[in-house]
């Protein structure tokens, strides 16, 4: 019999030739300095989404350990069967209060939250419009829903308005998808203008705020809070796995929406509930976030330091209406960005060399943490300065 997997080796060879293959290995605890590779070597970590350093916070870890001791390691079932725990309801109430919504629903991941919510809200009778730079799971969710799906150029509100004017009247429902903070560039969606269009054309808006959650707005409530925006059309999505240092994703919105998703979002219905440890860790992280402003202040200081340093080096920095912890430096091709990443590692800095198909063009993606020191940023800037001289 012919091997049905004989296509895999050529496919993997193609990944290597295109410089798309990746498999980094970390040792030890998450922190500003981590051990990378085999044999492990210490590098300043500019790849992490643990923006506030809460994944290694003593009180967050203690909460997770205590939850395991009290409730065990797993939820042991889907939440509509045997997997519902008091911790889940407690976490969802805390998220809703934090986000200023009537209710919230916790999923096993941010991707599951997006895929399940989009498929529950729209189908082949409906219209979905999304920013071209949206996270991959928003795009995948739109396609899996079988709705008619159009992308508009990045942050181009005029193009979005034209799509709504041309197509909206032909469909039952309309859902607009956008990141709050775009994950690869760190820029921010023009949410006020998008929400105005949504209200004018009777459209729902799902804002994926994975990278604004915990970082922007009062008490880290996110991009919408930072911009002072609210609307009955909004569906707020965020993660527990980035600034909150745990695992999972959530949807926050009106009570009717959340009740509907509990009975129609397949990625929630058919998944085991979030583990007690993850739920407890997220709750503890939320408490730290809202009671200890020093974490966000430290992150803001490092963002400001790096932004000024990059400008002094003449690096192209995107306009930043809000202080997000993501910076990108374009590269001409995958081979070059891999070389840059290797040279930065030799200088003691671990920076993500991001290539297609994750992004349309290669770039260095720099992310900051609250526990980075001024010296860490200075070392990165010195390494980038040396790199630019050689280019």
Swiss-Prot record:
Pfam families attached to this UniProt entry:
Aminotran_1_2
Q: Which GO terms describe its biological process?
A: biotin biosynthetic process
The keyword Transferase belongs to this UniProt entry's keyword annotation: yes
Q: Which reaction does it catalyse?
A: 6-carboxyhexanoyl-[ACP] + L-alanine + H(+) = (8S)-8-amino-7-oxononanoate + holo-[ACP] + CO2
The annotated pathway is: Cofactor biosynthesis; biotin biosynthesis
| Binding annotation for substrate | 22, 135, 358
Which Gene Ontology molecular-function terms are recorded? 8-amino-7-oxononanoate synthase activity; pyridoxal phosphate binding
Residues that bind pyridoxal 5'-phosphate: 183, 208-211, 239-242
Q: Does the keyword Transferase apply?
A: yes
Q: Which cofactor does it need?
A: pyridoxal 5'-phosphate
Q: Which residues carry this modification: N6-(pyridoxal phosphate)lysine?
A: 242
Its domain of life?
Bacteria
InterPro entries xref list: Aminotrans_II_pyridoxalP_BS, Aminotransferase_I/II_large, AON_synthase_class-II, AONS_Archaea/Proteobacteria, PyrdxlP-dep_Trfase, PyrdxlP-dep_Trfase_major, PyrdxlP-dep_Trfase_small
In the Enzyme Commission scheme, what number(s) does this protein have? 2.3.1.47
Query: How does the record describe its quaternary structure?
Result: Homodimer.
Function text: Catalyzes the decarboxylative condensation of pimeloyl-[acyl-carrier protein] and L-alanine to produce 8-amino-7-oxononanoate (AON), [acyl-carrier protein], and carbon dioxide.
Family statement drawn from the similarity comment of this UniProt entry: Belongs to the class-II pyridoxal-phosphate-dependent aminotransferase family. BioF subfamily.
The name of this protein is Putative 8-amino-7-oxononanoate synthase
């Amino acid at each position: 019999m012919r091997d049905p997997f004989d296509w895999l080796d050529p496919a993997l060879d193609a990944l290597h030739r295109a410089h798309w293959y990746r498999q980094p290995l970390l040792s030890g605890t998450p922190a500003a300095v981590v051990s990378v590779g085999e044999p492990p070597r210490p590098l300043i970590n500019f790849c992490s989404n643990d923006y506030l350093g809460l994944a290694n916070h003593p009180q967050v870890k203690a909460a997770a350990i205590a939850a395991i001791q009290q409730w065990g390691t797993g939820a042991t079932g889907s939440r509509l069967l045997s997997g519902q725990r008091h911790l889940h309801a407690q976490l969802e109430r805390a998220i809703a209060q934090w986000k200023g919504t009537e209710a919230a629903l916790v999923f096993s991941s941010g991707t599951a939250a997006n895929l399940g919510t989009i498929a529950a809200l729209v189908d082949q009778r409906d219209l979905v419009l999304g920013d071209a730079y949206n996270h991959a799971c928003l795009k995948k969710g739109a396609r899996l829903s079988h709705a008619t799906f159009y992308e508009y150029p990045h942050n181009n509100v005029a193009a979005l308005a034209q799509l709504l004017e041309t197509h909206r009247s032909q469909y039952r429902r309309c859902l607009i998808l956008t990141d709050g903070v775009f994950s690869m560039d760190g820029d921010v969606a023009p949410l006020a203008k998008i929400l105005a269009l949504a209200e004018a054309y009777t459209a729902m808006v799902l804002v994926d705020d994975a990278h604004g959650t915990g970082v922007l707005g009062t008490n880290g409530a996110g991009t919408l809070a930072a911009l002072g925006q609210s609307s009955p059309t909004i569906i707020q999505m965020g993660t527990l796995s980035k600034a909150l240092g745990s695992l999972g994703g959530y949807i926050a919105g009106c009570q009717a929406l959340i009740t509907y998703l509990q009975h129609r979002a397949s990625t929630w219905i058919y998944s085991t509930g979030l583990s007690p440890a993850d739920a407890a860790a997220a709750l503890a992280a939320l408490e730290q976030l809202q009671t200890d402003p020093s974490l966000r202040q430290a992150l803001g200081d490092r963002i400001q330091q790096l932004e000024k340093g990059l400008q002094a080096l003449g690096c192209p920095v995107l306009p930043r209406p809000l202080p997000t912890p993501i910076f990108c430096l374009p590269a001409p091709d995958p081979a070059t960005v891999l070389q840059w990443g290797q040279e930065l590692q030799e200088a003691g800095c671990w920076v993500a060399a991001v290539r297609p198909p994750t992004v349309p063009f290669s770039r260095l993606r720099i992310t900051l943490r609250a526990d980075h020191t001024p010296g860490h940023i200075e070392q990165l800037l010195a390494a980038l300065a040396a790199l630019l001289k050689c280019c």
